Amino acid sequence: MNDVPNLFGSMVFNDTVMQARLPKDSYKALKKAILQGAHLELDVANVVANAMKDWAVEKGATHFTHWFQPMTGITAEKHDSFISPAGDGTIIMEFSGKELVRGEPDASSFPSGGLRATFEARGYTVWDITSYAFIKDGTLCIPTAFCSYSGEALDKKTPLLRSMETLNQQALRILKLFGNTKTQRVITTVGPEQEYFLIDKQSYLKRPDLLYTGRTLFGARPPKGQELDDHYFGALKPRVSAFMKELDEELWKLGVHAKTKHNEVAPAQHELAPVFSTTNIATDHNQITMELMKSIADKHDLACLLHEKPFAGVNGSGKHNNWSLSTDDGANLLEPGETPYENAQFLLFLVAVVKAVDEYQDLLRVSVANAGNDHRLGANEAPPAIVSMFLGDELTEILEAIESGADYHNREKLQMEIGVTVLPHFFKDTTDRNRTSPFAFTGNKFEFRMVGSTFSISGPNIVLNTVVAESLALFADRLETASDFQSELAALIQETICAHKRIIFNGNNYADEWMQEAAQRGLSNLRTTVEALPAFISPKSMALFTKHHVFTDTEIHSRYEIFMESYCKTLHIEALTMVDMAKKYIIPACLSYENELAELLLRKKSCGDFDCSLEEYLLDKIASLSGYMLGKLTELELALITSKQEQETEPLARFYRDSVFARMSELRFTVDELETLVAKKHWPMPTYADMLYSAN
């Protein structure tokens, strides 16, 4: 495979294909609908559908599906064939504009947070014309939004599109104030860096916890973890390299701009990073990426683990959300330029983000909250649960100068001195990077690093788009009525810096001292999902989302219920899995080894006066720990029984966090210690050492 340009997008009904296959008037009408949000007439939809069907059939497709993203966090699809009876015992291949534009899946079988009852089954999928259709496994996949019969959004795409629209509207107001009348649309762009683990498939299949929950619920640390930092950017192992090569090719066929691949910090951990694209398209592409990672890994006798913390004791996996603002004519609104201190438009957009992150830090925390990410955030491997911003030395100095009214002296670009004459000379950047920051400015974009690896990026970007839109709306309200635009602009930037500078922190976010300082600054520290989620239904949050028409009140409350229920169900499944594994695997293994030790001890004693201290020690230690394990297992089972008595979602979630998870941790500690004592031939499942070094 060398012809990447021809391979790229070959399974996508993209703009090039549309131009070649659609009549000019139909193509123009479709492009107008895509670029300007104009209504697409049914006769045009019929033409597009027929062209799409012909193209798909030529590519080997036999079915089509409305591909949507319900509140499960993964994609959903129902496959219908193109065939239609011809009346003479034959068939024809048909696909109408109505079938393209709208579908009717069962809305009661997906999470709805009470929006849909079992008897209220009707839901609609609606074509997202801004995201290209593509062919996957012989099926034409049409990206769609998903709503209920009464119009409520039941998916992650609909509110994302709404948030992009409100940000577009408010950003255009700001640009017009600066005299820009050419820009017709402002879009948000995202490049999500996807981290994941690869282990041998046979090891995976022998671990019930990985099969049921995506993470290991038991497992002692191996002798070697990530201490030597020798896995990060290391040479790719042959099987991993073959997997990555096929993944690249399949992603390129589907128009995904897969760009960078490398080993990550933890053993068996890797990363794939794409080029930026429009946020809703980037969201679709990331869902495709995660799906293909799993299916292609399986073909290579590997298992792809996307959980935020599949292995204790080594780094977990995140998904850095690189977010920026661009115009339809190619300008990046977060590009500082050569002289950022003189770039008033950039500074206004910058402080709008600063204001948004400070005022809605709790909502940003909500957007990355789930049971899996609770294991990762604040664990000295990922940003803490405290939201702060890194701007770097240069921008921080500029903002400090504006705040104080002092003159700013531009930083000189320094040439990098390496001390080797044969190496090329280059200028160093004006600021370093801070990998511990949850929300960092990295040149011409913001990198939101708190997002978990399993997440759809729609949630974090819905919040980010909406809170920035709110800042821009307030700025526009003030500047549009100003008698002197320039003086009002200067005052607004200065006031915003003074009011929100507490959110800026360029230091070490892992340090204990930062937690104390953050508390003094008044920043929130919502350590767990259960602490964070109530902020989603606060009056302030609800007013924000309804003002910008991103969510209705009922949609907000339904999502809150879904998030809380998901947290409870996740911990419930994990706890049941631990109980099952302890009873069916761990206890029999311990008894088997105890029996072997007891028989050996009896034989040695019957043969003479031999030293039996080792056997006696092991037998006593394992028997003692086994008894203690039984006690902790019983406590966990009792906690699960008690959980059934609580009917309200929020108290139930607190019970799972405080009682069930605590019992799970105690049981795990005991089992992990037993693993270090029981002979390997008796231990019933692959260990961390077996799994983390299995994908060679």
What is each PLM-predicted segment?
Residues 1-14, 33-35, 223-232:
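Gly-rich Lys/Arg/Thr-decorated short loops/hinges at beta-loop-alpha junctions or inter-strand turns
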Residues 7-120:
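Active-site core of metal-dependent hydrolases
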Residues 44, 68, 96, 274, ...:
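Active-site proximal loops enriched in glycine and acidic residues that flank catalytic Cys/His/Asp
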Residues 1-27, 41, 122-142, 442, ...:
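Catalytic pocket of metal/acid-base enzymes, prominently hydrolases
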Residues 120-306, 315-318, 325-561:
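Glycine-rich, acidic/polar active-site loops that bind/position phosphate-bearing ligands
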Residues 73-89, 105-108, 113, 207, ...:
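Short linear, low-complexity motifs centered on an aromatic residue
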